[in-house]
């Protein structure tokens, strides 16, 4: 009996140790629909937590917990970098997105989200689609990134790609002293929703591209697109993209692509792309700096989609989204300059900026002004 009690206490201690940086972790279980989900709220200093919901057949609950804790913390930094009044959150549904989905499952998930009373807003991520969240919307108002037909801003890959292009302009300026996108060659990994749009825009500017993707149709399409532009496209094997000679490596597919194995192969001057968590560890950021490779922090350069979904809660306004997305240029350039000034990596400079912004904004958000409600309460009316 004593042994059982001791084990339980130790398990509780381990769980709280894992979530020591987080405000709240919610385990959601609905046996009728098969829903097993975890919602993690990292920090709400800037406002309610915001983050997508992914569905994945995790091997264990612990694996799912590790993922949602890591991703939600990353969202706190991403929201701070994008200067939106939201904190970091994330949700994961444990299950196979090909076989385990149902309208009832997402309605059940929506009910759990609604039970948080506006502390958490969510939308699509890996393994989930907007069709899934149309069902969740029947149970909660805290869904963002909805289709235009349902009052949302539409395809978030458009501002995401635009933000990457602004980041590439800033990177070109830092490398060559001018923003001209045609001035550089680019090795693009991934021609998905975002990567393809980035490649199209670069071709229109007349840039030289080296591309790879597992989808042969996407490769054929971008080659056909190149024929009507002054740019050029060369298709390379998936693993060869790391050793491809180019000015800028543009990862637009997987996370963790900058690691011990790939970092020695790189033959580029800079890395700037839309993929999340490009550095396997922060140490790899330091290794890039030692090699003289400029790195655009992923959560700054790919923030265009976040800017759009956060802006929905003011009411859809595409011009406002475009104006905010354009600021990614200044944010990337400032990060480069600050890192150089302080003798630190660009990722360390970005993290410092975000942490300072959260601390400074925290004082304003906790200063009571009488009749003026907190911003995030007002937004519940949209």
Curated annotation (Swiss-Prot):
Reactions catalysed, as given in the entry: L-phenylalanine + NAD(+) + H2O = 3-phenylpyruvate + NH4(+) + NADH + H(+)
EC number of this enzyme: 1.4.1.20
PROSITE patterns for this protein: GLFV_DEHYDROGENASE
Transmembrane segments: none
SMART domains: ELFV_dehydrog (SM00839)
A molecular-function term among this protein's GO annotations: nucleotide binding
Binding site for L-phenylalanine: 78, 276
Residues that coordinate or bind NAD(+): 54, 125, 156, 160, 190-196, 213-214, 253-254, 274-276
InterPro entries, per database record: Aminoacid_DH-like_N_sf, Glu/Leu/Phe/Val/Trp_DH, Glu/Leu/Phe/Val/Trp_DH_C, Glu/Leu/Phe/Val/Trp_DH_dimer, Glu/Leu/Phe/Val_DH_AS, Glu/Phe/Leu/Val/Trp_DH_bac/arc, NAD(P)-bd_dom_sf
GO annotation terms (biological process): amino acid metabolic process
Swiss-Prot/TrEMBL keywords: NAD, Nucleotide-binding, Oxidoreductase
Active site: 90 (proton donor/acceptor)
Temperature sensitivity of activity: Optimum temperature is 52 degrees Celsius for amination. Exhibits prominent thermal stability, specifically a half-life of 23 days at 30 degrees Celsius and pH 8.5.
Regulation: Activity is not affected by the metal chelating agent EDTA. Addition of 1 mM Mg(2+) results in 15% increase in activity, while the enzyme is strongly inhibited by 1 mM Fe(3+), Fe(2+), Cu(2+), Zn(2+) and Ag(+).
pH dependence per the entry: Optimum pH is 9.2 and 10.8 for amination and deamination, respectively.
Function: Catalyzes the reversible NAD(+)-dependent oxidative deamination of L-phenylalanine to phenylpyruvate. Can also catalyze the oxidative deamination of several other amino acids, with much lower efficiency. Shows activity towards various bulky aromatic alpha-keto acids/esters and (S)-amine alcohols. Can catalyze the amination of 3-(2-chlorophenyl)-2-oxopropionic acid (CPOA) to produce 2-chloro-L-phenylalanine (2-Cl-Phe), a chemical compound used in the pharmaceutical and biotechnology industries. Shows a preference for amination over deamination.
UniProt record similarity statement: Belongs to the Glu/Leu/Phe/Val dehydrogenases family.
PANTHER family according to UniProt: LEUCINE DEHYDROGENASE, VALINE DEHYDROGENASE
The name this protein goes by in its record: Phenylalanine dehydrogenase
């Amino acid at each position: 009996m004593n042994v059982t009690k001791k084990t339980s206490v130790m398990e509780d201690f381990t769980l709280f140790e894992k979530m020591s940086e987080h405000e709240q972790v919610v385990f959601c279980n609905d046996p009728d629909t098969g829903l097993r989900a975890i919602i993690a709220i990292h920090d709400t200093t800037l406002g309610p937590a915001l983050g997508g919901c992914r569905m994945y057949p995790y091997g264990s609950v612990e694996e799912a917990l590790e993922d949602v804790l890591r991703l939600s913390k990353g969202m706190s930094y991403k929201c701070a970098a994008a200067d939106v009044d939201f904190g970091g959150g994330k949700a994961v549904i444990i299950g196979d997105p090909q076989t385990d989905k149902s309208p009832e499952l997402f309605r059940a998930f929506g009910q759990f989200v609604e039970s948080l009373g506006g502390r958490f807003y969510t939308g699509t991520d890996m393994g989930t689609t907007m069709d899934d969240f149309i069902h969740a919307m029947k149970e909660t108002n805290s869904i963002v990134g909805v289709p235009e037909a349902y009052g949302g801003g539409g395809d978030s890959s458009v501002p995401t790609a635009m933000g990457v292009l602004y980041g590439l302009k800033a990177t070109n300026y830092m490398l060559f002293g001018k923003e001209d996108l045609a001035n550089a060659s680019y090795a693009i990994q991934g021609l998905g929703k975002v990567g393809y749009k980035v490649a199209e825009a670069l071709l229109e500017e007349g840039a030289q591209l080296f591309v790879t993707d597992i989808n042969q149709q996407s490769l054929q399409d971008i080659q056909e697109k190149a024929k009507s532009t002054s740019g050029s496209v060369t298709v390379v094997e998936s693993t060869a993209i790391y050793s491809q000679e180019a000015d800028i490596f543009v990862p637009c597919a997987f996370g963790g692509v900058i690691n011990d194995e790939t970092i020695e192969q790189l033959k580029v001057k800079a890395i700037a792309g839309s993929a999340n968590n490009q550095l396997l560890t922060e140490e790899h950021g330091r290794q890039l700096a030692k090699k003289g490779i400029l790195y655009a922090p992923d959560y700054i350069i790919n923030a265009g989609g976040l800017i759009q979904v956060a802006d929905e809660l003011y009411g859809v306004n595409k011009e406002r989204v475009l104006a905010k997305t354009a600021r990614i240029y200044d944010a990337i350039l400032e990060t480069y300059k600050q890192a150089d000034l302080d003798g630190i990596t660009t990722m360390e400079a970005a993290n410092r900026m975000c942490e300072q912004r959260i601390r400074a904004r925290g004082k304003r958000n906790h200063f009571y002004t009488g009749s003026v409600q907190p911003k995030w309460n007002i937004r519940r009316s949209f």
